[in-house]
A protein has these predicted regions:
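N-terminal low-complexity segments enriched in Gly/Pro/Tyr/Ser
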Residues: 1-173
Length: 173
């Protein structure tokens, strides 16, 4: 899908980095400012004087990500707009890509990252495996069996193997 194509370049990023990047993408002007600031080889002490969103400030610790976002500003802007308007759909698309990568053996534990899959339940419709619980309701002499769906699905998380290290995976989406 178009949404999967949009998130493919970042879907396999560690969760914490991905979260910062998604929020930062909603501030494309600040991405440009941060990229320019980083190009000057700044004194990091001057970072606190910047009036940027916290996500942008934290991403300056990962200059290659800021550079990538700046180099692909149309993509960054589209990602930010989509994340603001459809955050659940963005996260679902990321999970679909992670599932494909896990199933194909591409996404797995490495010395740099720990990949975990766990089943979760949610009371909102989405793709996944459905389990139902029945509730009977009488209406006009007929009994209607309502079955609210409780979705069971797998969520794949990616964490750094070393908590003090940010790993930016390199892959061709």
């Amino acid at each position: 899908t178009d949404l999967e194509s949009l998130v493919a370049p970042i879907a396999l990023y560690p969760d914490q980095l991905l979260a910062e990047l998604l929020v930062a993408s909603t501030y494309p002007l600040e991405v440009v400012q941060a990229a320019r600031w980083l190009e000057t080889k700044p004194d990091l002490a001057t970072l606190s004087s910047k009036d940027w969103d916290a996500s942008i400030m934290r991403l300056t610790a990962v200059p290659q990500v800021v550079k990538m976002m700046n180099d692909h500003l149309d993509w960054t802007t589209q990602l930010g707009d989509t994340f603001l308007s459809k955050p659940s759909e963005v996260m679902d698309a990321i999970q679909k890509l992670r599932k494909r990568a896990t199933d194909s053996g591409f996404l797995k534990d490495t010395p740099e990252q720990k990949v975990t899959a766990k089943a979760v339940s949610a009371e909102q419709p989405a793709e996944g495996t459905w389990a139902t619980e029945g509730t009977s309701v009488e209406s006009g002499g007929a009994t209607i069996k309502a079955t609210p769906a409780v979705m069971k699905r797998e969520v794949i998380t990616i964490e750094p193997a070393k908590t003090d290290t940010v790993y930016v995976p390199q892959y061709n989406p």
